[in-house]
């Protein structure tokens, strides 16, 4: 549900830094590459259809090299459970037939097509059934929902991460930590990212890379030069003030859990004392527009000193949903009103985090311009 783009980008960079030149398709732009997709290096070698050729295909035969095929050495794809098309309501990821599948976390989302969490868990079960016996499933040991999925059936090697009893664990702070593989030191990550969520993303990527042949120590070392993904706490600009610069960030968070994780990560990175955190968010996804998770918004915004919600296009009352936050929350019916509210409240040293899964009406640039005026 969360961390798909970042974890996919981490894994892709690990493979790239270790000479594999992978192909990839990512739902964001990894800063290390500057593009969201490429084919990767083609390699000719022995027939790689170890689990049998894809449906509708037959393994090549005939000629002087009857088992030679041309294939991508490694291809990393970001996959999710959203439906394939209006005429195919199966989740997109059941079509991919992965050799290595990373299950990072799972909670209810996409209320426009799923009735409940159990319906999503069934789709994840279908995904696991497509992984061959020679494949690997990498799963977050902290997620009860994923445990339920695994108990429905597992026919491949399993590697877990995150929990104290998992195969891959971390010791240390999210920005600098040791990686343990079954309790033994396996590498160290020191990087510019923050947040426990990114620490978990790193463990998932390291466990997946190991299945492709990259040693955990080499994978951890590669993450030191990982530059994150655009729109993941991306600094869009700063405005200088005598009392401290105001920083404006852009983040893709739109689910309550993602909002909370993003703000908690920033709070942890800033430490204490720190400038205030101002959360500016747009409930734009289909799930949020339906109001399915509106009651979770005050919880998701606990780390914010002030919160500003864009209520345009909503069928529910954002003011009522945010009432438990009292004076800490304001609601703007349009972008102009929202910008005015944020600028009026902003102080030197503030950190303004803009969160939406869309363009948010160019609010980042408009805030920077208004703050500098």
Regions found by a protein language model. Give the residues of each.
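ATP-dependent carboxylate-amine ligase
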Residues: 46-50, 55-69, 99-100, 125, ...
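Active-site-proximal beta-strand elements of phosphoester/diester hydrolases
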Residues: 76-78, 189, 247-253
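Short beta-strand segments
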Residues: 22, 185-189
């Amino acid at each position: 549900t969360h961390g798909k783009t970042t974890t996919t980008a981490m894994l892709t960079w690990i493979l790239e830094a270790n000479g594999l030149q992978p192909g990839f398709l990512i739902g964001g732009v990894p800063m290390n590459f500057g593009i969201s997709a490429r084919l990767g290096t083609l390699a000719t070698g022995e027939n790689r259809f170890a689990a049998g050729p894809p449906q509708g295909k037959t393994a090549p035969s005939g000629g002087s090299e009857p088992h030679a095929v041309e294939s991508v050495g490694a291809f990393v794809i970001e996959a999710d459970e959203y439906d394939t098309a209006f005429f195919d309501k199966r989740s997109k990821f059941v079509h991919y037939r992965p050799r290595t599948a990373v299950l990072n976390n799972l909670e209810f989302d996409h209320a426009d097509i799923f009735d409940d969490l159990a319906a999503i868990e069934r789709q994840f079960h279908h995904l696991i059934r497509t992984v061959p016996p020679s494949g690997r499933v990498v799963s977050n040991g902290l997620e009860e929902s994923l445990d339920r999925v695994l108990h429905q059936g597992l026919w491949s090697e399993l590697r877990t991460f995150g929990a104290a009893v998992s195969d891959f664990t971390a010791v240390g702070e999210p920005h600098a930590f040791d990686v343990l593989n079954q309790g033994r030191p396996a590498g160290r990550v020191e990087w510019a990212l923050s947040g426990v969520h990114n620490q978990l993303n790193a463990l998932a990527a390291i466990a997946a890379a190991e299945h492709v042949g990259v040693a955990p120590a080499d994978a951890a070392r590669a993450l030191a030069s990982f530059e994150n993904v655009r729109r993941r706490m991306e600094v869009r600009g700063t405005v200088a003030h005598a009392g401290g610069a105001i920083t404006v960030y852009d983040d893709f968070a739109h689910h309550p859990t993602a909002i909370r994780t993003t703000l908690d990560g920033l709070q942890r990175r800033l430490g204490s004392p720190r400038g205030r955190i101002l959360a500016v968010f747009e409930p734009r996804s289909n799930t949020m527009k339906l109001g399915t998770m509106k009651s979770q918004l005050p919880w998701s915004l606990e780390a914010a000193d002030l919160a500003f919600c864009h209520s345009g296009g909503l069928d529910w009352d954002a003011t009522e949903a945010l009432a438990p936050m009292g004076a800490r929350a304001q609601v703007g019916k349009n972008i102009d009103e929202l910008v005015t509210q944020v600028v009026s409240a902003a102080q030197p040293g503030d950190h303004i985090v803009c969160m939406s899964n869309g363009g948010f009406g160019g609010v980042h640039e408009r805030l920077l311009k208004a703050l500098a005026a």
